[in-house]
Amino acid sequence: MSSLTLSKEEEKRLKGLGFLNNKGTDNFSARILTVNGKVTAAQHRAMADAAETFGNGILTFTTRQTVEVQGIPYEKLEEFQEFVENAGMAIGGTGAKVRPVVSCKGTTCQYGLLDSFAISEEIHKRFYEGYHDVKLPHKFKIAVGGCPNNCVKPNLNDLGIIGQRIPHFKAELCKGCRKCSVEAVCPMGAAKVSDK
């Protein structure tokens, strides 16, 4: 049972900072931001230290590729935030605004058709950071997928980018065999050899 009594304004303020009240307790979870899910070994250690020092020792990963430190008492929230900021990280990712940008590993994945890390980092700077104080009617989610395999589900976001392969036709190499390799590998049957 929770014995903590917070005003609605204080709850809203904390949520806007990235602190979410843990159901039935006086504790909070804090969302530590990542840029497209990438964190360094030093950041991992700092997050683990923060979880053990301020929370209940548990880290969870969100669908927006942020890391939640759970079980932080209300009276330790400010100290926790200072610790995280001193480690070069930030908390946030909640509220009616642009949410943290998610990305697949298309930059390094064998199926990646674009540099998903670079694109999502640019979008993060321009929209997550650039529009950080802009109040929206609802949360706005952005995802960058490196290929049509859809691992990060860009089509389920408010704005999704999906890498595509564009076949290049070189007429001078075509022998007119009517066994086009593009047609043979198109899983949707969208590419067809035609006399037109």
Where are the language model's segments positioned?
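Iron-sulfur cluster-binding cysteine motifs and their immediate structural context
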Residues: 179-196
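Small-residue-enriched alpha-helical segments and adjacent helix-cap loops
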Residues: 4-6, 30-168, 173-176
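Intrinsically disordered, low-complexity polar/charged tails and linkers
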Residues: 1-25
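Short, flexible, solvent-exposed loop/turn segments with mixed acidic/basic and small polar residues
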Residues: 19-24, 55-61, 189-194
